[in-house]
């Protein structure tokens, strides 16, 4: 027996930036007052299968809970260029003034050179063991390994304990390693 959990989730965040009631001074009177500065899009798909089962073991105050699972995650980051007027220099560009096409990072549009589309795949598995070894003392151990298509593999472990001193007071502690892959952005 035991319990299975099969899941899949997808999410996307999209930020589009526009300039309204403004101009690119280097284009003078020919500058439109409204233009697209570009957009950033992050998408993620998470899928996995988890399994959990309790095993009665003599000498333990509770069943040993064994949880295991596998996951797949896809991540994508896209940066799309804005209208060329948002980042190009027009015929009235004057390098001796602060005017022109804007200061980089301040209302400057995303250029064709900045445009990108990157993604990665992540595969992982885990195993988690947990039980009350005596009344009011719960202990456990977990291990997880993940492989990133763009960054390599990592394996991390965790040891944890929880002691119920009284119904109002609980002492918890854990020791673990951790890892976070660099952002795609």
Q: At which residue positions do the language-model features occur?
A:
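Short, surface-exposed connector motifs at secondary-structure boundaries
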Residues: 3, 135-141, 152-154, 164-166
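Outer-membrane beta-barrel proteins
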Residues: 4, 13-19, 75-81, 91-92, ...
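Transmembrane beta-strands of outer-membrane beta-barrel proteins
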Residues: 4-8, 64-68, 139-141, 157, ...
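Transmembrane beta-strands of outer-membrane beta-barrel pores
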Residues: 10-14, 53-55, 70-78, 143-149, ...
């Amino acid at each position: 027996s035991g319990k299975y959990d099969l899941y899949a989730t997808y999410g996307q965040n999209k930020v589009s930036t526009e300039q309204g009631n403004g101009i690119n001074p280097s284009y003078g009177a020919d500058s439109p007052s409204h233009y697209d500065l570009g957009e950033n899009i992050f998408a993620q798909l998470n899928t996995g299968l988890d399994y959990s089962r309790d095993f009665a073991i003599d000498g333990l105050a509770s069943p040993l809970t064994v949880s295991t699972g596998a996951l797949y995650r896809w991540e994508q980051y896209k940066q799309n260029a804005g209208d060329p007027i948002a980042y190009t220099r027009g015929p009235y560009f004057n390098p001796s003034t602060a005017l022109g096409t804007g200061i980089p990072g301040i209302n400057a549009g995303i250029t064709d050179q900045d445009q990108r589309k990157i993604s990665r795949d992540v595969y992982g598995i885990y195993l988690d063991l947990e039980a009350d070894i005596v009344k009011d003392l719960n202990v456990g151990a977990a291990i997880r390994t993940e492989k990133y298509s763009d960054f390599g593999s990592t394996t991390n472990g965790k040891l944890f304990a929880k002691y119920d001193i009284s119904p109002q007071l609980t002492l918890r502690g854990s020791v673990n390693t951790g890892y976070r892959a660099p952002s795609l952005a």
